Amino acid sequence: MFGQRQSMIVYLHSLKHAKILRKYGNIHYISKRLKYAVVYCDMEQIEHMMQKLNKLPFVKKIEQSYRPYLKTEFENSRPDRAKEYDYS
């Protein structure tokens, strides 16, 4: 039903225009102090949306999130000491 989503961080000159970003995706978070918004959209449309957003006059820059491309399954480098001892 839902496709893969990816976030992009949109840095703004002014937060006055932050509501306009709703047309381009789901707004997850808006930082008032640092003047950025985290916007989610489909992975297939991310490049197209970034080009559209770059044309807007109130957008400083856009960064794409690389979280979908990172490995999130970690291996333990040290074995657990409690499992080494046999208490039976």
Curated annotation (Swiss-Prot):
The keyword Cell wall biogenesis/degradation does not apply. It comes from the Bacteria. Coiled coil: none annotated. GO terms for cellular component: cytoplasm. It is found in: Cytoplasm. Its main location: cytoplasm. The keyword DNA repair does not apply. Keywords: Cytoplasm. It holds the Pfam family DUF2129. Belongs to the UPF0298 family. This is UPF0298 protein BA_4142/GBAA_4142/BAS3844.
